[in-house]
């Protein structure tokens, strides 16, 4: 029986943080280890260039860092094909063919793109590559005939646009060579969008309000101890608010089942007064370190031989290119432009 295919990835614009870990990485490792799927995981450097065109050095540096993060959380190149987007030229060619099937108006209506354009403050200077990156994503997904794509809820419009492109292509060229993907969305809304340590709506590399998978134990401790709690909880005996308190928000996400009773008791104690923020932060720190310590240890080990890390990426890219080339050939045959 053929295994369903999963495609997932990240933009290499910096090291990955806890938001990436609970939002996608942890689930990827789970899906990989279930051994029910054929996994493709990629570093979307071409997509990163759509809004970092003048920061190619950052992207180059981030390739190695993100690869280390992948390996340290448990992604295994023997079980998952890990590759670099720019090393698969077939993806760019597929994008060109798909762009002929999507109107500019449709691209401009994509809610995800509209939101990101506003957030990035492009104004009238929107890079054309950024505007069409949903088409590039469709090429990434369809090149590997992915059945399933794990994404955040904010990416639903991107999946739908890919499905539209697939239907349009298959209808236009009377073929079924492209596969309509389904999105896999987070069940835990809190985990799907982890807030920053400062209470900002999202943990973000650009805002510097996150805990990175590469942070050492002392850095993690300092960041946890500076987390946003209840600004009105000045004295230990004061009643405290749980809502909007990042320490309790993180506890809800990272705690295991066996921790739940203790956390509920802490919440009640905090709300009636008599429990200080330092104690709750230390409790959270222990829980985070339980998760981060083995990741940190593996990362340090892999970092000793970056040559081997890049050999892994090269081998994965070669494997991925073979698959993408086969799909491209099928696409060109359907279009009637496979001349030789």
From Swiss-Prot:
<dbReference type="GO" id="GO:0004830">
    <property type="term" value="F:tryptophan-tRNA ligase activity"/>
</dbReference>
<dbReference type="GO" id="GO:0005829">
    <property type="term" value="C:cytosol"/>
</dbReference>
<dbReference type="GO" id="GO:0006436">
    <property type="term" value="P:tryptophanyl-tRNA aminoacylation"/>
</dbReference>
<dbReference type="InterPro" id="IPR024109">
    <property type="entry name" value="Trp-tRNA-ligase_bac-type"/>
</dbReference>
<keyword id="KW-0547">Nucleotide-binding</keyword>
<dbReference type="Pfam" id="PF00579">
    <property type="entry name" value="tRNA-synt_1b"/>
</dbReference>
<feature type="binding site">
    <location>
        <position position="194"/>
    </location>
    <ligand>
        <name>ATP</name>
    </ligand>
</feature>
<dbReference type="InterPro" id="IPR050203">
    <property type="entry name" value="Trp-tRNA_synthetase"/>
</dbReference>
<dbReference type="InterPro" id="IPR001412">
    <property type="entry name" value="aa-tRNA-synth_I_CS"/>
</dbReference>
<feature type="binding site">
    <location>
        <begin position="152"/>
        <end position="154"/>
    </location>
    <ligand>
        <name>ATP</name>
    </ligand>
</feature>
<comment type="similarity">
    <text>Belongs to the class-I aminoacyl-tRNA synthetase family.</text>
</comment>
<feature type="binding site">
    <location>
        <begin position="202"/>
        <end position="206"/>
    </location>
    <ligand>
        <name>ATP</name>
    </ligand>
</feature>
<feature type="short sequence motif" description="'KMSKS' region">
    <location>
        <begin position="202"/>
        <end position="206"/>
    </location>
</feature>
<keyword id="KW-0030">Aminoacyl-tRNA synthetase</keyword>
<dbReference type="InterPro" id="IPR002306">
    <property type="entry name" value="Trp-tRNA-ligase"/>
</dbReference>
<comment type="subunit">
    <text>Homodimer.</text>
</comment>
<dbReference type="InterPro" id="IPR002305">
    <property type="entry name" value="aa-tRNA-synth_Ic"/>
</dbReference>
<dbReference type="InterPro" id="IPR014729">
    <property type="entry name" value="Rossmann-like_a/b/a_fold"/>
</dbReference>
<feature type="binding site">
    <location>
        <begin position="19"/>
        <end position="20"/>
    </location>
    <ligand>
        <name>ATP</name>
    </ligand>
</feature>
<keyword id="KW-0436">Ligase</keyword>
<protein>
    <recommendedName>
        <fullName>Tryptophan--tRNA ligase</fullName>
        <ecNumber>6.1.1.2</ecNumber>
    </recommendedName>
</protein>
<comment type="function">
    <text>Catalyzes the attachment of tryptophan to tRNA(Trp).</text>
</comment>
<dbReference type="GO" id="GO:0005524">
    <property type="term" value="F:ATP binding"/>
</dbReference>
<keyword id="KW-0648">Protein biosynthesis</keyword>
<keyword id="KW-0963">Cytoplasm</keyword>
<feature type="binding site">
    <location>
        <position position="140"/>
    </location>
    <ligand>
        <name>L-tryptophan</name>
    </ligand>
</feature>
<feature type="binding site">
    <location>
        <begin position="11"/>
        <end position="13"/>
    </location>
    <ligand>
        <name>ATP</name>
    </ligand>
</feature>
<keyword id="KW-0067">ATP-binding</keyword>
<feature type="short sequence motif" description="'HIGH' region">
    <location>
        <begin position="12"/>
        <end position="20"/>
    </location>
</feature>
């Amino acid at each position: 029986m053929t295994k369903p295919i999963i495609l997932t990835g990240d933009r290499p614009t910096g090291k990955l943080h806890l938001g990436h870990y609970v939002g996608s990485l942890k689930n990827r490792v789970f899906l990989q280890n279930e051994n029910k799927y054929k996994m493709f995981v990629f570093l979307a450097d071409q997509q990163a260039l759509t809004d970092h065109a003048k920061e190619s050095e950052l992207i180059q540096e981030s390739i190695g860092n993100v690869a280390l993060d992948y390996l340290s959380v448990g992604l295994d190149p023997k079980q998952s094909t890990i590759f670099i987007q720019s090393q698969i030229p077939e993806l760019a060619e597929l994008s060109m063919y798909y762009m002929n099937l999507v109107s500019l108006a449709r691209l401009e209506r994509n809610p995800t793109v509209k939101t990101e354009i506003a957030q990035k403050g492009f104004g009238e200077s929107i890079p054309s590559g950024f505007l069409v990156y949903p088409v590039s994503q469709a090429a990434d997904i369809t090149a590997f005939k992915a059945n399933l794509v794990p994404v955040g809820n904010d990416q639903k419009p991107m999946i739908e646009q890919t499905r539209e492109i697939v239907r349009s292509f298959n209808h236009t060229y009377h073929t079924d060579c492209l596969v309509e993907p389904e999105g896999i969305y987070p069940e835990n809304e809190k985990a799907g969008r982890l807030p920053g340590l400062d209470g900002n709506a999202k943990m973000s590399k650009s805002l510097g309000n996150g805990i990175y998978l590469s942070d050492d134990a002392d850095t993690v401790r300092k960041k946890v101890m500076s987390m946003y709690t209840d600004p009105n909880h000045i004295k230990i005996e004061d009643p405290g608010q749980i809502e909007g308190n990042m320490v309790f928000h993180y506890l809800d996400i990272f705690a295991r089942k066996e921790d739940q009773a203790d956390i509920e008791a802490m919440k009640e104690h905090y709300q009636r007064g008599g429990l200080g923020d330092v104690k709750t932060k230390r409790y959270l720190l222990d829980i985070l370190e339980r998760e981060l310590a083995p990741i940190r240890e593996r990362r340090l080990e892999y970092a000793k031989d970056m040559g081997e890390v890049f050999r892994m990426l090269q081998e994965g890219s070669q494997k991925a290119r073979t698959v993408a080339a086969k799909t491209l050939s099928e696409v060109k045959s359907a279009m009637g432009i496979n001349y030789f």
